[in-house]
């Protein structure tokens, strides 16, 4: 008799996605990040749900409600810091997941890749709105500065900003709607992640060699479930170490001061995971140009499949492109550092150079190195 696991309508879907899924036998730990991202999402939804039970989205009580959660709610401090640092872990996994996709040519699965890019944008929007909710100084001014960027859009810009604010400045209406969207967004992310998985299972996973793995597949369970659990242990170890020993390591001290529209912080900056894009935005003196560069720094991911000229999918056997890839990684780290520095010499010059390098490597140098490597194959 066939197992109900393979015949029951619901169990069958789970079975084909996580148990009997044919998986390449040679995928490395770089393929762990998909399941880790799923875990991060579950952690964020769970902790967020408990935080929402005690949080009040009102300008007069938001800040004190967060203090109340931290001080008076049972394990409220832990839930709050797990949520805040969970977002950081989420983005670490996201960036590594995208990096793996770039390195091993996973972007050639167009549908999966494009849904993934939309997922990245949605996650960034969700994290930004979440950063506004504690209603500290950096929350308020971050919201003001970032939403104000939309005013650079010709004709409709200023109307659009006021529409998002729900008034003439970031105020009660803004906080309420940000809380509403921040609450619903993770469920949209979960739906998009399901579609992402659906498209991935249409083609199957890539593998480090970049060659077809059809003749050599193994079942996902028990091999990769065990491997994923190891990654999960490391993720939880990192998250709980941050939460229990250094909960404020990645947060801004300014956010422990109540939002004050009359007092601007000396240096407005977003959370660390947005700093690379923020540095690109600041490196262009023109407002509209900066906003375009900011948007393109993310949307360029959708163009990468069209810039792929190599005859090989993976970078595993392409030393020139490998060098460029790691230069790009170093460039992104430089941009992240610059985004957290004040707007003065030499940081401005370094930021402008790193921003030019970012686009130049992706748009020009990588396709060029692919062409050179194609020619070298004929030797």
Curated annotation (Swiss-Prot):
How cofactor binds (record note)?
Binds 2 heme b groups non-covalently.
- Transmembrane parts of this sequence: 33-53, 77-98, 113-133, 178-198, 226-246, 288-308, 320-340, 347-367
Q: Does the keyword ATP-binding apply?
A: no
What GO terms fall under cellular component here? mitochondrial inner membrane; respiratory chain complex III
Q: Which residues bind heme b b566?
A: 97, 196
Q: Does the keyword Glycoprotein apply?
A: no
So which cofactors does this thing need? Answer: heme b
> Where does the record place it?
Mitochondrion inner membrane
- Binding positions for heme b b562? 83, 182
Gene Ontology biological-process annotations: mitochondrial electron transport, ubiquinol to cytochrome c
Q: One Pfam family from the UniProt entry?
A: Cytochrom_B_C
Question: Which positions bind a ubiquinone?
Answer: 201
Function, as annotated, reads: Component of the ubiquinol-cytochrome c reductase complex (complex III or cytochrome b-c1 complex) that is part of the mitochondrial respiratory chain. The b-c1 complex mediates electron transfer from ubiquinol to cytochrome c. Contributes to the generation of a proton gradient across the mitochondrial membrane that is then used for ATP synthesis.
In Swiss-Prot or TrEMBL terms, this protein is called Cytochrome b
This chain's source organism reads Aotus trivirgatus (Three-striped night monkey)
- Gene designation per UniProt: MT-CYB
